[in-house]
């Protein structure tokens, strides 16, 4: 067996002296790259190995209740995507083996059981992922097995887009300008059409196996498909991508309109049912939409460079803000019962579908932090537990952006008025009436002015405002100024 090696296929470099020799048995670990098309790590493994075994590992720290950020919607979507992936691999003559346990223990077990010569996977960049992959590397080194990694998840690898001082950008615009310059953008590969033809399977019984059917019932409270916005899997992803290409031609003009459909691709990108390169290619002329992909890269860079943002403000002085946590107000916010229609519509959409329009995410987040004066960390965790497309880097980045504590964040004194947001982005209250049926027969002007008009609709079962916005805005400014004056 060969010695342990780490490589990045983005640079097509492998420092191992024996890499010209064909590897007999390879093991590819799927994570959030659940497709066999344009999967860099998988294609790398296929090109280097005679036989390629494929696996997925459910880990207790991610899919059980010990994970306080676990989303049942995300886990369900992931398992559906794994079912689709399993079918695709079976059609190619292979088998997707699924396990439950610690990554290093499962890898050690399989190296012995299948006589594995090299382990392949696509790199991830969160603190958890980095430690996980280190543990696999240690096992592989002890067993004299290669580890070969690839960069697949982002347009450009986190940590590679640097400023003139060779440091990570903390502002989006200079990051974006640099990343989209020829010097960097030339490294964005086109999607690959190569096929994997050497999937393998075994007749051996492998320990710690867990079927996807069992995983679905064991690790999730299943949300009926009729309620969710998107279903998992490559086939569903392709349909959504084709629909998005047709519907998003005017994205720059409509993306903030709460009643207009968005791309609905975020979960497919998160779990790799689509490659980021496929999405980039089809929308390459849609500058505003592509810009959103770069925000995703930006937040991945921030988390990679500043891992302390998970659990702490990126800007340390924001840790001194004295939040006014009101448990009852927080409960009303989570249930969509604050008496602020534009806020409640967003939260009800999230609770029902596992998804929320991006503009609604900003509105609801701002309301929690700068109107209810509740810490962004509570909102970050609640969103994480509900979102199908939950991504730690993006979710954390967006919440800290709203709070003012993150990279390139809005200033603390910028506070969204729910009424003005309603006027600007749902003037006819179509979005609100979709998610708050109690208001379906109420005039739009009364909904927009619900803070005063609710007294004229006492027969309506919808909540009256739990607080006075103007008063809370004043308190928010005092709360922040106590730290920053």
Predicted segments with their positions:
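Active-site-proximal binding-pocket segments
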Residues: 258-438
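A broad detector of short, well-ordered amphipathic alpha-helices
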Residues: 43, 138, 344, 362, ...
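Glycine/tryptophan-enriched, flexible segments
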Residues: 166-318, 425-426, 430-485
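Trp/Phe/Arg-rich N-terminal binding region typifying the photolyase-homology
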Residues: 2-4, 16-187, 348, 394, ...
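Charge-dense, low-complexity intrinsically disordered segments
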Residues: 68-72, 76, 228-235, 333, ...
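Short clusters of hydrophobic/aromatic residues that line enzyme substrate/ligand-binding pockets
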Residues: 162, 172, 333, 399-401, ...
